[in-house]
From Swiss-Prot:
This is Tryptophan synthase alpha chain. GO terms for cellular component: cytosol. Belongs to the TrpA family. It comes from Xanthomonas oryzae pv. oryzae (strain PXO99A). One of its GO terms (molecular function) is tryptophan synthase activity. Keywords: Amino-acid biosynthesis, Aromatic amino acid biosynthesis, Lyase, Tryptophan biosynthesis.
Length: 268
């Protein structure tokens, strides 16, 4: 959790926006995950969101659903994800890593047992898509005790009452879903409406606010970053990596995809 706080403080001091790429652990191959993570850092990633493959990813569009299915088919379970983070930490002790996933695998593992294992591996935070904020107190308490940030999600349909709760309990950063839908549906991105909401959230939240869903290239990243503390890019990157033939190709594709977004954010 401290790595996340330090990174955003550093970015704020330098007047820069956070670039947060999302990849699915185990896709395009088990061997490629860690090399791709390092490649993303070289290309300008400030935080990495690592997707935990799940059999029923309800918030994800077809691109990430297929990616998750491929990863599960290769055996990329929770143990693999934590081992990948542990391996990444052998060379990178600074870049925050946030896991994005669903409750079921965590509950099967045992929340406290998982949280302790995640921190030991080098994980900084967790974003649980299907954990309602009204039911998050126990999980948040366990995570806070061991040093994990519980990243919250807000969307255009989030009620004011729930927003108040999210803003007052936000840890690490608040992830604003720029439209009500599934990941990858970039045609639904409404920059103007999202920007207005982002400005409001940044005034209310006790943590940085980042925007995701629908960001697919340098132009959309720069546009959304104007009123956010950072942007998350997922489906478009996952789609680019899916075409990789080997680890080297995956690394090259990761850097080639992300570098223009970094440049656009720094020039915005």
């Amino acid at each position: 959790m401290r790595r996340i706080d330090f990174r955003f403080a550093e970015l704020r001091a330098n007047g820069r926006k956070a670039l947060i790429p999302f990849i699915t652990a185990g896709d395009p191959s088990l061997e490629a995950t860690v090399p791709v993570m390092h490649a993303l850092v070289r290309a300008g990633a400030d935080v990495i969101e690592l997707g935990v493959p799940f059999s029923d990813p309800m918030a994800d569009g077809p691109t990430i659903q297929r990616s998750s299915e491929r990863a599960l088919g290769r055996g990329a379970g929770l143990a693999y994800v934590l081992e990948a983070v542990h391996e990444f930490r052998r060379e990178d002790a600074a870049t925050p890593v946030v896991l994005m996933g669903y409750l079921n695998p965590i509950e099967i593992h045992g929340t406290r047992r998982f949280a302790e294992a995640a921190v030991a591996a080098g994980v900084d935070g967790l974003l649980l898509v299907d954990l309602p904020p009204e039911e998050a107190d126990e999980t948040r308490a366990i995570f806070t005790e061991v040093g994990l940030a519980l990243i919250a999600l807000a969307s255009p349909t989030t009620s004011e009452q729930r927003l108040d709760m999210l803003c007052s309990t936000a840890q690490g950063y608040l992830y604003y879903v720029s439209f009500a839908g599934v990941t990858g549906a970039s045609n639904l991105l409404d920059t103007y409406a999202a920007s207005d909401r982002l400005r409001q959230l940044r005034q209310r939240a006790g943590a940085p606010v980042v925007a995701g869903f629908g960001i697919k290239d340098a132009a959309s990243a720069a546009a959304m970053a104007v009123d956010a503390d950072g942007v998350v890019v997922g489906s478009a990157l996952v789609a680019a990596l899916a075409e990789a033939d080997d680890v080297r190709s995956a690394r090259e594709r990761a850097e080639a995809f992300l570098a223009p977004l970094r440049q656009a954010l720094d020039q915005a």
